[in-house]
A protein has these predicted regions:
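C-terminal accessory/tail domains of diverse enzymes
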Residues: 1-145
């Protein structure tokens, strides 16, 4: 059907289908799937303990604000960088515990390296793209008002 061509952020079928990250280079292609796998095979109770306290309206507001504010977007009184760091740690533990190794003996947590760099540098892919513009350039026209 034509409805199957609609690709929202995620779709629930006989499996969960997630949209990949946008503006993603080769170094981060596997980061998104690895992040979710790490949480699913990690401590779901720990993740649930965190997100169960989040208000649905605040989640939607953060989702809508994130393209403009990036890591400075607030969710439940903390910025997204805070939440990203916590959830990435949980995901990393999940992948380490899963202990699936490559030929070099490294576990799947290596796929999270790109996300860890983003958090450590506090710069998103969008921040890097905006950084290519002149400091004096007014980028507000890029956003709907």
């Amino acid at each position: 059907t034509h409805l199957s061509t609609i690709f929202t952020e995620n779709r629930l079928k006989k499996y969960i289908e997630l949209r990949s990250m946008d503006t993603c280079g080769w170094d981060c292609l596997c980061s998104g799937p690895a992040f979710y796998i790490g949480m699913l095979y990690g401590n779901l109770d720990e993740v649930y303990e965190i997100i169960s306290k989040w208000d649905n309206n605040k989640i939607i507001n953060a989702y809508l604000e994130a393209p403009q504010k990036g890591f400075n977007t607030q969710l439940m009184g903390k910025d997204l960088l805070h939440w990203a760091s916590i959830l990435l740690d949980i995901s990393k533990k999940g992948l380490e515990n899963r202990d699936i190794l490559n030929k070099r003996g490294k576990n799947e947590s290596l796929f999270l390296n790109h996300l860890q760099k983003v958090i450590d540098n506090k710069l998103t892919n969008a921040d890097h793209m905006v950084g290519k513009f002149s400091i004096s350039e007014d980028l507000s026209e890029l956003y709907d008002k």
